[in-house]
Amino acid sequence: MMMCSANLKFFPQLGWADFFRASFSMQALYTVCFYIIASCIPVVSLAGTFSVNPTRIELSKGIPSAVMHVTNSGEKDTTVQLHMLQWSQIDGEDQLKASRDLIATPQIFNLPAGSRQIIRIGMLKKSDGSVEAAYRMILEEIPPPPPPGFLGLQVALKISIPIFIKPELISKAENNFEINLNRSNEEEGNIHLNMLNKGSSHVQLLGVKIFADDGKENLVASYEKNLYLLAGQKKILKINAGKKIDSKGFLIKANMNGGVVEFHAKSGVP
């Protein structure tokens, strides 16, 4: 009753019957507006879904080929196309371009719902014996033609698989990987990790944790994303601690190639 009285203040000229008729009219208007707005929102149509195993491939002079399984776990048939790309980096940023160093067959195939396709990958170019070569194989879903009158957006799945051709001599990553730490803004807690991979093969970082090197190992900042640093590459990793950093020394624990490696670093200001 109190709510009705409050609402009547906005309709001083209406009686109770007129008020309820107006309320129902407004409700109908809101309903019409809702359907008009909803009709303007594009419909998103998802194509099929597929998975791959393994999720990375390593080849070498002694192992020049590999097999991958692509499984359609969805309820619809789908078509998948393969693209082979050479993978390089400039200051740690990925650069991709088409390559014929590797072959993958079949390059395009239909994948019925619930089925599995075998992909065979092989080397067409001899590996460089001193430095690892890196590639990316893109598995791209080709969505079917939209039905007549469909005005929405079709979303197709794309998976990128790293492929490495190992050099003949591989040195331990931790012996050829360097991390230095700089603070670009002490008050705001901005940290720059200068990373350098001097080795002949890639380094995969699965996360970095930075602690105060004061014996208590209080966590200062962390980076939880996955990244690759290819052979001979460098990268500046920018991390924000979200608070002022008082420590002068740091203990950096890097989850690198499946193991945790520790680095001691002193703070510097670039």
Where are these regions (language model features)?
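Beta-sheet-dominated interaction scaffolds and their linkers
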Residues: 47-73, 172-188, 226
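Short, hydrophobic/aromatic beta-strand segments
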Residues: 76-84, 149, 202-208
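Surface-exposed binding patches on compact interaction domains or structured appendages
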Residues: 73-121, 214-217
